[in-house]
Regions:
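PLP-dependent class I/II
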Residues: 1-286
């Protein structure tokens, strides 16, 4: 079948979306050493005559990694030899960036590949409007036309109320985003502080989005106070939920075992409680 390259860690839905479209997901594991980002060498090794798409998510979920313009250009150079391959740039977290980290979308970095690029975005993450279910895309005319046909026979169109709300949000973004990003940054620092102070956990600093991808490999194999051995990241996440009532997602769901995704887009008081409970629970493991 036709192949779609998906760098891991990835958003959990990507592989299943490809499978539902009768495609073959090709997972390429990235690593912390390279900032959780796909390298040109990895891309070149994964490409085949059957490759049809590359999915890039920047800022990324679950890691918060952001591709630089130079990194995107390097990937585009590899794709130059594969004219059948299109790129989906998932920019849904675009405005949520910390420390003045610049953002470049793939089509900007590689204008020579604009005719092969689909850029998708929305207001769900940037404007805290997940329930409004509204996104948008830009790409070559033939592809957008095909997407319109598919949507017209499935969801028909976005709610008119959602469209009006999104227009208002986008037209008044600056004031909201400044405050929202400041709040998220404080919460990011709080979670990173908890991780740094908790033996058995470690994490890089996310450049964007609103989750930390924490390494929990040193906790795997440890024993809980009730004598249960935590055999993998899923077991650890389940134990934290049952023992502390704190929900985190195991890295295996994102194609990267041995990690936990800790989201911090929650109310400050709840986040403080969650951090305390995670730290106290991890300290009980032997």
């Amino acid at each position: 079948g036709q192949q779609v390259i998906i760098p891991a860690p990835y958003w959990v839905s990507y592989p299943d979306m490809v499978s539902l479209a009768d495609g073959e997901p090709v997972i390429v594991p990235c690593d912390e050493q390279h900032g959780w980002k796909l390298t040109p060498e990895q891309l070149a090794a994964a490409l085949t005559p059957s490759t049809r798409w590359l999915i890039l998510n920047s800022p990324g979920n679950p890691t918060g990694a952001i591709y630089s313009e130079r990194e995107l250009r390097a990937l585009a150079d590899v794709l130059a030899d594969y004219p059948q391959v299109l790129v989906m740039a998932d920019d849904i977290y675009e405005p949520l960036r910390y420390d003045n980290t610049p953002f470049t979308t793939f089509a900007q970095a590689a204008p020579q590949l604009v005719s092969r690029t689909l850029t998708v975005n929305g207001v769900s993450k940037s404007h805290a409007m997940t329930g409004w279910r509204l996104g948008y895309a830009g790409g070559p005319q033939w592809l957008i036309a095909a997407m319109q046909i598919l949507q017209s026979q499935s969801t028909s169109n976005p709610s008119a109320i959602s469209q009006a709300a999104a227009v208002a949000a986008l037209n008044h973004s600056a004031d909201f985003l400044d405050g929202w990003l400041h709040t998220l940054d404080k919460r990011r620092q709080q979670v990173l502080g908890m991780i740094a102070a908790t033996e058995g956990l470690s994490a890089g600093i996310p450049q964007g989005a609103f989750s930390v991808f924490a390494n929990c490999q040193r906790l795997i194999g440890r024993v809980t106070p009730t004598g249960e051995t935590l055999r993998d990241d899923s077991g650890l996440a389940n134990w934290l939920l049952e023992h502390t009532q704190v929900a985190v997602l195991h890295g295996s769901a994102f194609g990267m075992p041995g990690y936990l995704r800790i989201a911090y887009a929650v109310e400050d008081g709840l986040l403080t409680q969650a951090c305390q409970r995670i730290a106290e629970a991890c300290a009980q493991l032997r």
